[in-house]
């Protein structure tokens, strides 16, 4: 029996931001953290990325404590280091310094090798009217789908 694929998305990010470029990064995790992710007990709500001394870190990513973990369990909202190539890190850091741009986690998944990966995007914040426009387009698409189903 094939295990269910883990695909945790930050739905709010696509509403609040316009994605310019995306990167797939590895995450430095402890044993109980990867076990919780495999159970689907993670959330990307209110998560953001920042640089410290040329390294990319993710803050506020919630990974629930592992139920079967002992006293050695992890802290649910600790900061976690992201792993990217130096070239990608430099490119992201330079672009992230520009006003209006930020680095946002978009999706957390487990690849074919069983490693946890985080898709991060270089993003620009949307204005209020852009958000309304996105909602209108989404509603229009939904209406069109309903019409074609009949």
Curated annotation (Swiss-Prot):
One of its GO terms (molecular function) is RNA binding. InterPro entries: SmpB, SsrA-bd_prot, SsrA-bd_prot_CS. GO terms for cellular component: cytosol. The keyword Heme does not apply. The keyword Transcription does not apply. One of its GO terms (biological process) is trans-translation. Residues 130-150 are annotated as: Disordered. Required for rescue of stalled ribosomes mediated by trans-translation. Binds to transfer-messenger RNA (tmRNA), required for stable association of tmRNA with ribosomes. tmRNA and SmpB together mimic tRNA shape, replacing the anticodon stem-loop with SmpB. tmRNA is encoded by the ssrA gene; the 2 termini fold to resemble tRNA(Ala) and it encodes a 'tag peptide', a short internal open reading frame. During trans-translation Ala-aminoacylated tmRNA acts like a tRNA, entering the A-site of stalled ribosomes, displacing the stalled mRNA. Belongs to the SmpB family. This is SsrA-binding protein. The lineage of its organism: Bacteria, Pseudomonadati, Bacteroidota, Bacteroidia, Bacteroidales.
């Amino acid at each position: 029996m094939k295990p269910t694929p883990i695909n945790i998305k930050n739905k709010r990010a696509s509403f609040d931001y316009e994605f310019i470029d995306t990167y797939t990064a590895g995450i430095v995790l402890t044993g109980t953290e990867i076990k919780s992710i495999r159970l689907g007990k993670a959330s990307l709500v209110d998560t953001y990325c920042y640089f410290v001394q040329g390294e990319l870190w993710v803050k506020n990513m919630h990974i629930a404590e592992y139920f079967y973990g002992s006293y050695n369990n992890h802290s649910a909202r600790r900061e976690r280091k992201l792993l990217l190539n130096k070239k990608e890190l430099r490119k992201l850091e330079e672009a992230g310094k520009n006003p209006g741009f930020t680095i946002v986690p978009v999706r957390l998944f487990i690849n074919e090798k069983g490693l946890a990966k985080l898709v991060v995007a270089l993003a620009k914040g949307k204005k209020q009217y852009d958000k309304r426009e996105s909602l209108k387009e989404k509603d229009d698409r939904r209406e069109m789908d309903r019409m074609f189903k009949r």
